[in-house]
Amino acid sequence: MIQGIQITKAANDDLLNSIWLLDSEKNEARCVAAVSGYEADQIVAINELGEFESREVAIEAAPRIEGGQHLNVNVLKRETLEDAVAHPEKYPQLTIRVSGYAVRFNSLTPEQQRDVIARTFTESL
């Protein structure tokens, strides 16, 4: 388990107020920040830090990137889009969101229009 700490008291003055990530499984300490004596990302064995007092510092795991997520919200009825495909002259100002951009529905190709309708309306999540 990894724990974040700030050293508040130590025999080694270089450790005062430094921030570390302690990995108890590997018995390693990674320096996050120190005024002097240690470099950022320097790794030492925990016992090399000697005797010290510390306070816990909350750490936040970096988000995992698993591929893009994108949500376009269009507040329309399916019938409206289907009617716009059949009668584009009735909907010259119909604007929808596609890939983060606002676009006139009638400017899309028929294939793109069908794709928008298929992706916009679902029976369940």
UniProtKB/Swiss-Prot annotation:
InterPro entries the record matches: Auton_GlycylRad_Cofactor, Form_AcTrfase_GR_CS, Gly_radical, Glycyl_radical_cofactor_GrcA
Q: Which portions of this protein are annotated as coiled-coil regions?
A: none
User: Which GO molecular function entries does the Swiss-Prot or TrEMBL record give?
Assistant: formate C-acetyltransferase activity
Q: Which residues form the Glycine radical domain?
A: 5-125
Q: Do the record's keywords include Cytoplasm?
A: no
Would the keyword Cytoplasm turn up in this protein's UniProt record?
A: no
Where on the chain is Glycine radical found, per UniProt?
G100
User: Cross-referenced Pfam families, in alphabetical order?
Assistant: Gly_radical
**Alphabetized UniProt keyword annotations:** Organic radical
| Origin superkingdom | Bacteria
Q: Which GO terms describe its cellular component?
A: cytosol
HAMAP family given in the database record: GrcA (MF_00806)
Function, as annotated: Acts as a radical domain for damaged PFL and possibly other radical proteins.
Question: Which NCBIfam families does this chain map to?
Answer: spare_glycyl
Record-given protein name:
Autonomous glycyl radical cofactor
